[in-house]
């Protein structure tokens, strides 16, 4: 059961990552004139909606509503990581150091996904 849930979560995260980045292209976010927190929040909301759907699936199976607290922590962590790395990514693109921007973008996605998987697995094992 744990393996099935973890697999579904991983697939949801990967699908979300692809779909979320297609709906709000990172290039548009990175080329924004000002460091707008609303753009970051909008990106995270679209990125997080399928994860929220996964939480409702989890609630339907286990009748445990505290999974929503896990989702909120992941949401907050994602906003913080996006905000902290956003300025670095924008300056890298402005200076035409695209390799740095790509490293930071994938690094931030790796951090968020790792945080989600570790905290989810820890939550299930309790």
Model-derived segments and spans:
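Helix-coil boundary and interhelical linker segments in multi-pass alpha-helical membrane proteins
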Residues: 1-9, 52-70, 117-126
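Alpha-helical transmembrane segments of integral membrane proteins
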Residues: 4, 8-12, 38-42, 65-73, ...
């Amino acid at each position: 059961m744990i393996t099935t849930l973890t697999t579904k979560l991983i697939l949801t995260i990967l699908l979300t990552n692809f779909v979320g980045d297609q709906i709000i292209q990172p290039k548009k976010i990175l080329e924004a004139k000002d460091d707008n927190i609303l753009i970051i929040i909008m990106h995270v909301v679209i990125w997080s909606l399928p994860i929220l759907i996964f939480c409702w699936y989890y609630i339907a199976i286990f009748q445990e509503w505290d999974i929503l607290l896990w989702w909120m922590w992941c949401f907050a962590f994602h906003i913080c990581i996006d905000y902290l790395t956003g300025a670095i990514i924008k300056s890298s693109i402005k200076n035409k150091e695209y390799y740095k921007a790509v490293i930071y973008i994938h690094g931030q996605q790796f951090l968020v996904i790792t945080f989600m998987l570790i905290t989810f697995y820890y939550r299930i094992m309790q």
